[in-house]
Amino acid sequence: MIDKKTFKLSILIPCFNEKLTIISIIDEVRKSLKKNNFLNYEIVVIDDFSSDGTTQILKNIESDKDISIFYHTQNQGKGSAIQTALKNITGDVVIVQDADLEYDPSDYNKLLLPFFETNADIVYGSRFIGGGKYVRIHFFWHYLANKILTFICNIFINLNLTDMETGYKVFKSSALKSITLIEKSFSFEPEVTIKLAKKKFKFFEV
């Protein structure tokens, strides 16, 4: 189990052309951390060669003490952005936070609870298990494709995940650093799941 009082949290925010949301998501992350009394943290932003003004916005907040910002010199994909972040984190637990506001940082306490109360190594925030008051309705073909991909992945890794493609993934950093990630794009999602499952790390969904 992770000691809630002493652990350090790393929040990774890969972004590409998110000028309309990048400051908002950083503000929401900070609000959630303060509300849940997670005071030992770092926010790591990776700008994947944005062309819409995101880079200039990030340069204006480079001096913020709780943020580290890294800039790719060419667009490489989400997987590559996460690989860059992992080389520079210092936290015990890692949250991957998309920059487009689809996933709400107010869920952090729920996502982190298994680390405090069990021996969880990885926690995925599922959009389909319906543990909250309501569940967002998704486009049918995206839902079906995700279900098929998750089902196929479960066969190979002997798990019963409901939402492998979820953007909310939380890891012990020691687990993540024990594997070698090579996928540059959104193929990161199945790659990280399969490689961690093969090492018999303990998965939870919330």
Over which residues does each language-model region extend?
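Cell-envelope/extracellular polymer assembly enzymes that use nucleotide-activated donors
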Residues: 8-10, 42, 191
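N-proximal low-complexity "stem/linker" segments adjacent to membrane-targeting elements
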Residues: 1-31
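Short beta-strand/loop segment that forms part of the nucleotide-sugar
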Residues: 13, 26, 30, 37-49, ...
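Acceptor/aglycone-binding surface of glycosyltransferases and processive sugar-polymer synthases
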Residues: 72-88, 93, 105-186
